[in-house]
Amino acid sequence: AVGDYKKLSNEVGGMNTALPEEVADKMKALLTEYNAKEEKTFEDILDFHVKFERIHPFQNGNGRVGRLIMFKECLKYNIVPFIIEDNLKLSYYRGLKEWDNEKGYLTDTCLTAQDKYKEYLDYFRIAY
C-alpha cells in the first residue's frame, strides 16, 4: 500500500539499496542521527537525502519523496530551496553515487538548481 515500506528489493541509479527487512531499522537510525542535529546546514540536508536514497524505503517514488523532503527542509531552515530539473538529472545521479568520495558533484548540482530557483524568486521580487 502507499506509504508502506518496500516488500521487494529495488535499486537507484545502479546502486544497491537496503534490503526490505533492513528498512525500518535503517530509517529509524537515519532519522535519529538527523534529528539530533539542532540546526541543519545545506550539507546536512544533502547528506540526509543521499542516505535516504540509499535506503530507498518505498517500493516506488523514493526520488520524488526524497527531493520533496529536501525542499521542505530547506524551507524549514531558511535555506533557498531548489528543484532538480531534467537537465540536471544525470549530474544529480552522479552526485548521489559519488557522495562518499566527492561531495562536490551533488553539492554543485544542487547549488546550480538553487541558483535557478533564485532567478524565479528574483523575477517575482521575493526576498531570500
Can you annotate each of these PLM segments?
Residues A1-Y128:
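FIC/Doc superfamily catalytic core
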